[in-house]
């Protein structure tokens, strides 16, 4: 039944052009119903999964090879699937308002975007290694089509090809790693590999680790494979808002979290992930504050966030896993809101250049509220989900026996730069006096353009007040699933350790000074 419903979602996706022709401006709302329905179904699984009982489904796929299309939803899969479907539904609504009914590519866009949502949903719920790889490659192909949607432009074609070459090459590495993992362990389901406690010191085990990490690094744009992500900003903003905040770039992080129980005790795990994550985190944050285009600022802060997630998983501690889970959710919410708000600003003013944008608040109050809510969360200001993520990150650094000081300095530095980037996007563009030489005449936008940003921006704040339910229903199950063992991932608005509060205050004060 699950597989049939997933296939039906792909079928609906390819009916996107017809749906647009038949229903016009209502097509985006109708197509958004598919991911919204998946989201609603996933919510019904929360009690079961939070009690530690995974949801499973399996269909015989290739009987002669004993290959099954198997699916497995535990705490980690559930969290990612909720992000994929929830943000996906909002993006579908946003897309119609952003592109308009006269955009000649909109029918194909609906098809590609809904198919991408379905592929991501399949990827984060897949248990079988072959099934996971099929969905992984589908996301690469569909991202190529989405980034190159306006193929009349050379930049769009070039950026789409660059993304496909880098992520496609990583996909080949991943295939090799998954095959080695399946053959050496004798298991082809990720849950079975984890439960078997399979590990090894053989060369083949190390090779599998390296190849899987390479696949993840290319998908999640770790240095030196990061170039495709900023260049992909030539894509329409709905593509950037989904692929580059909540979906595609998180696929590599999800994969690393999924194989964490198998690989994290091997010395190569930390040697690969920690340097890559640290360099990506700092370089992304530094380049972000040197941009003057809203989307490129967001692209580089996304790089920094992906580096942070890779770094946390590479540390190999329970607290770091907890921090990674919280940061993953927080980033998806505030970054999705910021990308969509940036698109709304571009739609209303005709520019994303922060040197020209001034005094948007009076003409775009709802969009301004949305971008402010999300930017404050990105800056890690209390009382937001972004603040909880920063708090757990700092606590993970304090917990380390060795390397802690370096990590803490790096965490504070990236936090300072993130706050500076958030300020660049909000203070002058929204609240300064309009400049006569930049007579932009910003105007209000339709509900489709502000609904997604305001929902995600408000969630970045509202969820921070629900630390008890969030800890019980989402953070603890997701962190436990990623670690492969029970983790009590309680969240606190006021940190238990005064040192965490002091470091957080230092980060904010330094960011304000910058």
Language-model segments: residues:
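Hydrophobic alpha-helical transmembrane segments
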Residues: 70-85, 202-217, 408-415, 490-511
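Hydrophobic alpha-helical membrane-insertion segments
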Residues: 32-47, 170-178, 371-379, 452-471
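Transmembrane helix-loop-helix hairpins at membrane boundaries of multipass inner-membrane proteins
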Residues: 1-4, 14-111, 183-202, 206, ...
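Hydrophobic transmembrane alpha-helices and their helix-loop junctions in integral membrane proteins
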Residues: 90-107, 113-132, 141-445, 465
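Membrane-interfacial helical/loop segments at transmembrane boundaries in membrane proteins
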Residues: 53-65, 189-196, 392-396, 469-495
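Cytoplasmic/organellar membrane-interface segments at the starts of transmembrane helices
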Residues: 361-367, 418-514
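Short phosphate-coordinating micro-motif centered on Lys-Gly-acidic
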Residues: 137
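Hydrophobic alpha-helical transmembrane segments of polytopic
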Residues: 2-9, 27-38, 77-84, 109-116, ...
